Amino acid sequence: IAILMHAPAYNYRTDELNDYARKILRRTKGYKVDFITGHRHLNSTADIAPEIIEHSVAQVGGNLWFAPMCPDGTPHSVLTIEERNGEWSWRYRLLGESAEKQIMIVEDSADEVVIRIVGWDKKWSVEWAENGKDMGAMERTDMVDPDYRYYVENEANYNDSVMGHLRRKLISFPHYYRLKRTTENSEITITATDRFGRKYTIKSEKR
């Protein structure tokens, strides 16, 4: 069963279902349920329970139409869902980009690389290689999105009310990974695998 509603089913601050979602699930007991929700203007996927998932969909137009991306760095994009024989798969699709673009480099220096996974959830894995040598898993990290921070601090120019709202959303999110180069300016290859086994690759070239 797919349930589409504006209000989120899950309270991400308390890690609990909202009361109205509990009532819905009592009525749908025994079924696989996917909630597709909005309101938060953020992208996240919550595995609430076995066979119960919430897809919290980021706003396609950015943060309340005032920023070119959502506070978690999600750019203009849509959630695409494919159904085959009763089974769902999904991923975010950046507007004007291939569906294969799921990794974005947000920091790239001589000694460190930080990436954002657009449609990330806890079932993704991310590995990296340096100059062709496998270096294992990247370190996941929480951080304020660098692109959103730059926009708010350097480009946004609205009234005090709007600016206050934009600044309040400068909070940490979990869908970032970082690595430390062992050799300055080395060539880095990053491979991310989503919950469906699809692989995505991006490179940070030698400088």
Task: Spell out what each predicted region is.
Residues 145-180:
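Aromatic sugar-binding surface patches on proteins
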Residues 141, 204-207:
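Beta-sandwich/jellyroll recognition modules and their flexible linkers
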Residues 131-146:
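Short, surface-exposed loop motifs enriched in S/T, G, D/E and P with embedded aromatic residues
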Residues 1-56, 77, 118:
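His/acidic metal-ligating clusters that form di-metal
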Residues 52-131, 165-166, 172-205:
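Binuclear metal-dependent phosphoesterase catalytic core
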Residues 42, 61, 142:
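Residue-level detector of flexible, active-site-proximal loop/helix-junction positions
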Residues 10, 63, 135:
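Flexible, glycine-rich phosphate/dinucleotide-binding loops
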